[in-house]
Amino acid sequence: MQKLVDLEEPQIWRGAVFRVKGSHPYEELVDFMVVETTDAARPLGIMVATGYSAGHTIVHLPPEAIVLRSKSISTAWLKANWSKWVYPDCPIDQVLFMKNYVI
């Protein structure tokens, strides 16, 4: 895992995971995952991946977050909009990133 703020890749793909310090209604640590949606205008969203709320989609990301002709999120957009669109309770400099879960 690395800090999201240190990520240099220009795009973040479906299946990527963000680990944050949670607050109510989440556990002490919570993972969020980039998922595909069924909304053609907003094809990617963020879903809770761990704990009691696992499986809940918390946001369908806006079109400006999506990299053209791909199903990926702009890393720069996500860094600039983390607290507005994803999870304001955890500052961006404390968000951890991994490309996907490894089993």
State each model region's role.
Residues 1-13:
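Mixed-charge, Lys/Arg-rich low-complexity intrinsically disordered regions
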